[in-house]
Design a protein with these regions (language model features):
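Non-catalytic terminal/accessory regions
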Residues: 1-220
């Protein structure tokens, strides 16, 4: 996972994970009512998890997921506001299996109490995967795997930079508008004979990304 925005991470720096729930709920109240696209909700949730990992004494992501399941999900359910429900939907989309199950069940109980879902709730976590590409140097030292995906008419792209000189670990990852990102990549490849840019099958992209995730992150 790429490091979170340092301004967000700073919110959690003084806190152990167990005490971060109130801060996350406060951020949710400030932000989630203004998000209208599933991609924005997913990115916000990812940034929060990254901030918790960066800011709460360097806790590992599995520990963060366990703490969110134990403390944040019950706190959000008790709050039972539209923003808290939105937070639960986000956690259900991007969390570990245990967190996903707990957040989804809590969200259903909140909606049963009469709280309305955000307009992106049905789409979050369920994009349609489009074309995939491989971009790298001819020596194979580094490569980027780009996967386009969309919700309805909106198309985005995820690029993951893999460093094979460092054990196939993930060096960086980012999300952008698909058309803009691919245009930039095409231009870079056309101007450099040592760059390879080619389409690959989604199954191939998935296998390469799974290997990179299993290898872990490059040390910062």
């Amino acid at each position: 996972m790429a490091q979170a925005d340092p301004d967000i991470a700073a919110l959690f720096a003084p806190l152990p994970p167990a005490q971060a729930s109130n801060v996350v709920l406060s951020e949710a109240r400030e932000v989630l009512g203004h998000l209208h696209r599933p991609i924005d909700a997913e990115l916000w949730g990812s940034d929060i998890i990254g901030a918790l990992s960066d800011g709460t004494h360097g806790a590992d992501v599995p520990d963060i997921m366990a703490e969110l399941t134990a403390s944040l999900v019950p706190a959000a359910e008790e709050s039972a506001t539209p923003e808290a429900l939105a937070l639960l939907r986000i956690l259900a989309a991007i969390g570990s299996p245990a967190l996903t199950a707990a957040a989804a069940e809590a969200a259903e109980r909140v909606t049963a109490g009469g709280v309305a879902d955000p307009d992106w709730a049905a789409a979050i976590g369920s994009p349609t995967v489009g074309k995939c590409w491989h971009y790298g140097d001819v020596g194979g030292r580094q490569e980027s795997i780009t996967v386009s995906f969309g919700y309805g008419d909106a198309e985005h792209a995820l690029s993951v930079l893999i460093d094979h000189g460092r054990g196939g670990k993930i060096k960086d990852a980012w999300v952008d508008d698909a058309e803009g990102l691919l245009d930039k990549t095409w231009m870079a490849a056309e101007n450099d004979p040592l760059i390879v840019f080619e389409p690959i099958e989604p199954a191939d992209a998935r296998a390469r990304l799974e290997n990179a995730v299993a290898a872990g992150e490059c040390p910062s």
